[in-house]
């Protein structure tokens, strides 16, 4: 009887000084935040944004941002969970978003993939109402808007087009077709590329990374998800961002160090740290 080949243990790429991780979930990773931040630093990661996609997760993100100077927070209710966005949750989110260590409202957005597949997934009309609420909070607080989009390109572009514009709109874990990338870039949105840009079949994502003007590209792990090649399927963490950086740098015709400098400047600008 044949046995499945064990997955290799993920290890960081070569150390690339000045890296960033624009979107990660420290509270969902296996190890303690302090350990994750230390390993990320050893891999060259100078700063990262940890994301809360529910109220408890947002509290944890903000706590991590206060505990570590290189960590910032994003706070929101995930589109599939907007049934949790009651008045009490709204009031607490407004407080968290106002905190200087919170640099973005997110992740918010639209997700049609889970509608009908998950009993707890909110319907699209509720998701849209919650997205508009989050956009208003981002505008009021002058914070970036961090967007989750799964199988909702047309509806998302429609909502973003007729809503007030925040200081920056980041399409996290960008995974949409090239025509959506072009439309988003024309509007000035920032495309944040995760580990799936390294997947062999995703040449169109690499083309989107190539097309994006300077200042409209970020890189992220979305850890513990979206582990890049050659460790796809294993558990992700911020220290593995170098694999995505190498891929995006090659797509953009840059050295890894040049890409690190570019995305670090974009991180500072969109998250209000410049």
Regions found by a protein language model. Give the residues of each.
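Mid-domain alpha/beta scaffold segments of enzyme catalytic cores
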Residues: 1-274
């Amino acid at each position: 009887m044949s046995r499945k080949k064990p997955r290799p243990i993920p290890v960081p790429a070569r150390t690339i000084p000045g890296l960033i991780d624009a979107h990660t979930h420290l509270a969902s990773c296996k190890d303690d935040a302090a350990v994750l931040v230390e390993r990320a630093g050893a891999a060259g990661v100078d700063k990262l944004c940890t994301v809360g996609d529910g109220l408890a997760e947002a509290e944890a993100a903000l706590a991590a941002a206060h505990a570590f100077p290189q960590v910032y927070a994003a706070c929101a209710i995930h589109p599939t969970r907007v049934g949790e966005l009651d008045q009490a949750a709204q009031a607490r989110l407004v407080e968290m978003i106002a905190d200087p260590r919170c640099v973005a409202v997110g992740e918010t957005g639209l997700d049609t993939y889970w509608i009908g597949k998950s009993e707890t997934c909110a319907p699209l009309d509720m998701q849209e109402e919650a997205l508009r609420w989050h956009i208003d909070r981002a505008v009021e607080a002058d914070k970036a808007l961090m967007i989750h989009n799964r199988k909702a390109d047309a509806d998302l572009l429609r909502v973003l087009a007729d809503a007030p514009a925040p200081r920056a709109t980041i399409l996290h874990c960008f995974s949409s077709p090239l025509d959506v990338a072009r439309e988003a870039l024309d509007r000035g949105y920032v495309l944040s590329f995760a580990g799936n840009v390294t997947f062999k079949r995703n040449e169109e994502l690499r083309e989107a990374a190539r097309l994006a003007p300077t200042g409209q590209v970020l890189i992220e792990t979305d850890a513990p998800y979206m582990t890049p090649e050659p460790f796809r399927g294993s558990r992700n963490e911020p220290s593995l961002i170098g694999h995505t950086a190498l891929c995006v740098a090659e797509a953009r015709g840059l050295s890894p160090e040049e890409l690190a400098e570019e995305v670090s400047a974009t991180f500072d600008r969109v998250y209000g740290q410049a």
